[in-house]
Structures are given as C-alpha cells and as structure tokens.
C-alpha cells in the first residue's frame, strides 16, 4: 500500500489505558513493528513545559496540564503512520477526547486494578495516585483508588476501536496482536489520497 493512499484516520494510532498498562513500553515497539513514528505525549508535554508532570500538577494544577496536553496533541493533526501514547486521563478532558475521536484510531490497553496496583505501588511520579500530603499508598489502598478511577474512565476507554487485554501476556505477544489488528483495520479502511479524496474506481 503506497504512503500516498493510506487513510490518515486509521494510521494515526492513539494508545490509551491507565498508567502502568504498558503504553510507553508497547508504543515504541508497536511503532517499530508497523514502520510508524512514535510520540509519547507525557514526555512531549514535559519538554514543552520545561519541567516534569509532577511539578506541572503541583505548581499549575491539573487544568493547566490538560491544556498543555491538548496543545501537544494538536501538533499531530493530519499526521499518518504514527503511534501516539496518551496520558491515562487524556480522554477525560472533553476537548482532547473530541480531538482524538476525529483525528485517528483509539486503541485501549486494558489491565485489571490488581495488576496495575502491583506495577505502580513503588512509582512516585503519578500525581493522581498519591495519598494526602504525598503519602505513599499501601498496595491495597492503591488498588482501591485505581478501581475507583477506572470506573470513571472506563466509559471512554471502551469507545476504542480496538481493545487488548495486557494482563498475563508477554509484551511481544501484545505487540504482535496489535500489529495484526491495526494492519487489518488499515487494509479495510477507505483509501484516501494526499488530496483527502478517495481514488476513483477503475
């Protein structure tokens, strides 16, 4: 399939899922497997702001972070053959959700609260998972908090065109599964040329 005919809608891939679901690990591997570019939105936001996300939250608040996130997302408008790793809460910000829905294909990396807690219990760089005054949660407390946040986010996560369960699965297997499904999705999609029009049938 020529690059000039690949549909933009289906070859701009947004990876969503809770922190710890594997987006930042799977994303570059998936992009490499597909021959696509890769962008980690959280890393791009930090570069744009000149400081880590924890400081953005602490000094400017979540609303300022979400707006920075949206502006970063808009830089990929019109791109194709790119995998974009989203922050876990990006879909909860309505303007970002609307942009993503119209710009590309959403893929949900799904994992259980128990497995997410196991992966995140020793992480200190997730602002929404901290206790009061930055106190570290016990694993049980963390799992319960993740469960509550997942319940809030799940309706939008479930809008994804593709969902892949990452629990009890090797990273390589997940990448292979996603590669097959995305390539199938791109093949089935209407072909769009550089002028944005579908080519005429012979």
Curated annotation (Swiss-Prot):
Q: Which Pfam families match?
A: SKI
Subcellular localization(s) per the UniProt record:
Cytoplasm
Known pathway = Metabolic intermediate biosynthesis; chorismate biosynthesis; chorismate from D-erythrose 4-phosphate and phosphoenolpyruvate: step 5/7
Q: Got any disulfides in this one, which pairs? A: none
Q: Share an example GO biological-process annotation for this protein.
A: aromatic amino acid family biosynthetic process
Instruction: Name the major location.
Output: cytoplasm
Question: Cofactor(s) for this protein?
Answer: Mg(2+)
UniProt binding sites for ATP: 20-25, 126
Q: What does this protein do?
A: Catalyzes the specific phosphorylation of the 3-hydroxyl group of shikimic acid using ATP as a cosubstrate.
Protein name per the record: Shikimate kinase
Give the organism the record lists. Chlorobium luteolum (strain DSM 273 / BCRC 81028 / 2530) (Pelodictyon luteolum)
Q: Lineage, please?
A: Bacteria, Pseudomonadati, Chlorobiota, Chlorobiia, Chlorobiales
